[in-house]
Amino acid sequence: MKKIGLLFMLCLAALFTIGFPAQQADAAEAPYKASITNISTDGGVYGKINYGQGQYWRVKYNITVSGKLLDQNGQPVPNAPVRFEADTKVGNTTQTASGTTDANGTFEVPMYLGPAAGYYTYYTSVSVHYYDIIPFRVFSGESRLVSTDNSLYHFAYQVRR
């Protein structure tokens, strides 16, 4: 009987220590919404693409995030702080960049991501692409915002066939 009780306690302890991934900010709690209109990058990998895990921006080392901050009524939010975070695979680091919206609520924030590891592969007729899928978060002040984009394809390299 003691073994069953001990086993139950261990299972219960394991149940409460399991971690869950961070989720999108709750729209009811977030003061603003970040509408990302463009993410430009270096390395000739510009634009959104679908490698099979969803339609995400494909980026390399350096990016510039452009968009607009909107309040809950869809109106632009002028002169507000905006911060971006991305968790990269090389070194398991969180990269951050900050900026401020202009008088029209728009932002354009440069951000350094560094190199990607290339844990995922995508095969084309002429090459193989190696990339990571990294979480991408947006904040204003300490509040996590609802965003149009929450993940990025962090491009590592390609091998021509």
From Swiss-Prot:
Residues 1-27 form the signal peptide. This is Uncharacterized protein YlqB. It comes from the Bacteria. Induction: Transcriptionally regulated by SigD. InterPro entries: CarboxyPept-like_regulatory, Ig-like_fold. The keyword Secreted applies. Keywords: Secreted, Signal. The gene is ylqB. It is found in: Secreted. Its main location: secreted. It comes from Bacillus subtilis (strain 168). One of its GO terms (cellular component) is extracellular region.
